[in-house]
């Protein structure tokens, strides 16, 4: 994108009222783009936003003066290699947007507005509660005090609110009630279309994602990678106990959907669960290519150069005829899109796959993904919130080998 006419990068500017779900959408977009290897910077605009709010009648010259430091900073950020910068403003006036357009154009930045609108009062109330309890700007204050501050700010911003319109001749997407209505105007490139596709899949429902590797397999016991081996005796015990621990973990089989890969060991692990099951080939384990069925010791002794390459850059290293972690992330993109639309889902699959999914929800760096510890016979519950993902773990008391390997 930066090679196009010397453009610095893409600035995605979120606008809309507080408690509309705007901040949640901005943070999720930042997490998604980072996970997809797009260098992304989420800019904290809170102080500027407050300044603009206190001077809501500022003329264009004063607006530009207030906003210029942000774009001066973004110019530096883009020159250091960032591809996308995300801004999150409560302002939604025509005068404000014109200033943003002029500042971005003067610095040769692509600009895309995202207006987030919520008309569902129940969702607005839930978002206000979430802000009071978890926002770094409100959680230190008494709940009622925070709530009143947020309600007052909504009232003030509503006075000057002007929705985006096609007459403005700028790139934008207007999202009403999380995809119930979607207006897209003047997209200019593939990345913008991917952003719209992702945002259109976001939902507000509170839900959890449960993760578990398959039960211990014969290949796990033998120290081999890849393959499509069956469960070991210990793995079969884990599968038999899984329904009991699903119940203990307050998952409940009613309304729960279980996703597995197409491989035998995950299907065997899920067979005692009395709920809807879906097989996804996209959840199959990382393809080890010509090394499939080998142990790590065998690879290091017989293919030392390959072992060294993988140890030096585990995320990008691709097995001959196989995959890298980066390939797996690309393969999992449709899974992530579907997870954003779903309710409670229990995913039973493989170590590399779960590392990538786990890393997405915890917003971990790509370099960290290949080293995340996802033990056998452990259930991980992830509950995504606006400002963090809450995690709980339960270990099922069936012993299993460890397949965790540290950095070399």
Curated annotation (Swiss-Prot):
Residues that coordinate or bind beta-D-fructose 2,6-bisphosphate: 213, 220, 226, 296, 310, 314, 325, 351, 355
Binding site for beta-D-fructose 6-phosphate: 157
SMART domains: PGAM
Residues involved in ATP binding: 16-24, 127-132, 307-310, 351-355, 387
EC numbers for this chain: 3.1.3.46
UniProtKB keywords: ATP-binding, Hydrolase, Kinase, Nucleotide-binding, Transferase
Record-linked PROSITE patterns: PG_MUTASE
Entry annotation: catalytic residues: 88, 214, 285
Record bears the keyword Secreted: no
Keyword Transferase attached: yes
One Pfam family it belongs to: His_Phos_1
Listed GO MF terms: 6-phosphofructo-2-kinase activity; ATP binding; fructose-2,6-bisphosphate 2-phosphatase activity
UniProt site positions, description: Transition state stabilizer: 213, 220, 350
GO cellular component, one term: cytosol
Annotated catalysed reactions: beta-D-fructose 2,6-bisphosphate + H2O = beta-D-fructose 6-phosphate + phosphate
EC top class, as a word: hydrolase
GO biological process: fructose 2,6-bisphosphate metabolic process; fructose metabolic process
Role of this protein: This is predominantly if not solely a fructose-2,6-bisphosphatase.
Family stated for the protein in its record: In the C-terminal section; belongs to the phosphoglycerate mutase family.
Name this protein carries in UniProt: Probable fructose-2,6-bisphosphatase C732.02c
Organism, as annotated: Schizosaccharomyces pombe (strain 972 / ATCC 24843) (Fission yeast)
């Amino acid at each position: 994108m930066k090679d196009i006419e010397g453009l610095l990068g893409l600035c995605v500017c979120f606008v809309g009222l507080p408690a509309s779900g705007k901040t949640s959408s901005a943070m999720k977009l930042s997490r998604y783009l980072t996970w997809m290897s797009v260098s992304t910077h989420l800019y904290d605009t809170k102080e500027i936003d407050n300044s603009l709010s206190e001077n809501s009648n500022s003329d264009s010259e004063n607006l530009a003066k207030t906003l210029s430091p942000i774009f001066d900073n973004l110019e530096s950020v883009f020159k250091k290699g960032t591809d996308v910068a995300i801004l999150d403003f409560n302002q939604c006036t025509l005068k404000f947007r014109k200033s943003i357009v002029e500042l971005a154009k003067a610095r040769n930045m692509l600009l895309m507005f995202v207006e987030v609108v919520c008309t569902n009062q129940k969702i607005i109330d839930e978002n206000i509660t979430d802000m009071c309890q978890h926002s770094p700007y409100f959680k230190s204050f008494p709940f009622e005090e925070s709530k009143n501050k947020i309600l007052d700010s909504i009232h003030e911003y509503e006075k000057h609110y002007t929705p985006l319109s096609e007459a403005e001749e700028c790139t934008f997407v207007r999202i009403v009630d999380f995809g119930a209505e979607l207006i897209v105007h003047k997209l200019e490139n593939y990345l913008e279309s991917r952003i719209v596709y992702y945002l259109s899949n976001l939902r507000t429902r509170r839900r959890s994602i449960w993760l578990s590797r398959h039960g211990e397999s014969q290949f796990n016991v033998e120290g081999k990678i890849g393959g499509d081996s069956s469960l070991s005796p210990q793995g079969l015990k884990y599968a038999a106990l899984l329904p009991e621990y699903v119940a203990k973990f307050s998952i409940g089989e009613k309304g729960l959907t279980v996703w597995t890969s197409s491989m035998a060991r995950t299907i065997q692990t899920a067979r005692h669960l009395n709920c809807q099951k879906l097989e996804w080939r996209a959840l199959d384990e990382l393809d080890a290519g010509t090394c499939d069925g080998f142990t790590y010791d065998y690879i290091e002794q017989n293919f030392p150069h390959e072992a060294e390459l993988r140890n030096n850059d585990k995320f990008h290293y691709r097995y001959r005829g196989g995959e890298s972690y980066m390939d797996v992330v690309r393969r999992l993109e449709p899974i992530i899109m579907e997870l954003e639309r779903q309710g409670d889902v229990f995913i039973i699959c493989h170590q590399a796959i779960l590392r990538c999914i786990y890393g997405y929800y915890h917003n971990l760096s790509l370099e960290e993904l290949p080293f995340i510890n996802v033990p056998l016979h452990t259930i991980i519950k992830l509950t995504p919130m606006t400002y963090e993902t809450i995690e709980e773990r339960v270990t099922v008391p069936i012993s299993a080998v460890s397949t965790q390997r540290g950095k070399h």
